[in-house]
Regions:
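Short, intrinsically disordered, charge-balanced linker/junction segments flanking boundaries
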Residues: 174-177
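Non-catalytic alpha/beta scaffold blocks inside enzyme catalytic domains
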Residues: 1-166
Length: 177
């Protein structure tokens, strides 16, 4: 039997992610990356339950927050990576849980991001951060010749534009043979 709460029928809840990860059940967290997330604000009573453990680097050695705003949760972060706002970036928009229909909308930048720029001139943000991190870790599927199509043509994945183009292509070609 489980020693902590499990919610098998609940959609996408993170109420036990931090308490479980900080207590080591079922797995201990070694790093936490938050993206536009503020669980301490969004989950009632969570701060009182995990405050001391969240601030203890022996319990959670690394916290990185990618966010356009300072909030209650990223106040604990070792690093805060600036992110863009919705009018500055690419993205996919879908309804939250509980909507009985599948739907998806595309978003593209209409203004230049105000975030700091990397050495190559690109705005620092979630996509550029994760692409750079994946390349630094040597993960497959990023960089030059990252992705191949069925005919063997290779495509790069170095920018947010390429990130979202590949995602859009997967959606557009879903089910097509």
């Amino acid at each position: 039997p489980a020693t902590a709460p499990w919610f098998p029928n609940a959609p996408g809840l993170t109420t036990e992610l931090l308490p479980g990860g900080l207590s080591g059940y079922p797995y201990a967290l070694k790093a936490l990356i938050l993206w536009a997330a503020n669980p301490l604000y969004g989950i009632p009573g969570l701060r009182a339950r995990i405050d001391k453990n969240l601030a203890d680097p022996r319990k959670l050695p690394l916290i990185v927050s990618v966010d356009a705003f300072i909030n209650e949760s990223n106040a604990y972060a070792d690093y805060i990576v600036p992110d863009s706002l919705m009018y500055e970036s690419w993205g996919w928009v879908a309804p939250w849980n509980g909507v009985p229909t599948k739907a998806l909308g595309a978003r593209w930048p209409v203004i230049e991001p105000k975030a700091a720029k990397a050495a190559d001139g690109r705005a620092i943000g979630m996509e550029n951060f994760f692409i750079a991190l994946a390349k630094a870790m040597g993960l497959p599927g990023f960089g030059a010749d990252a992705i191949t199509d069925p005919e063997g043509n290779a495509y790069a994945l170095n920018t947010p534009e390429e990130w979202y183009l590949r995602g859009g292509a997967n959606i557009a070609w879903l089910g097509v043979t």
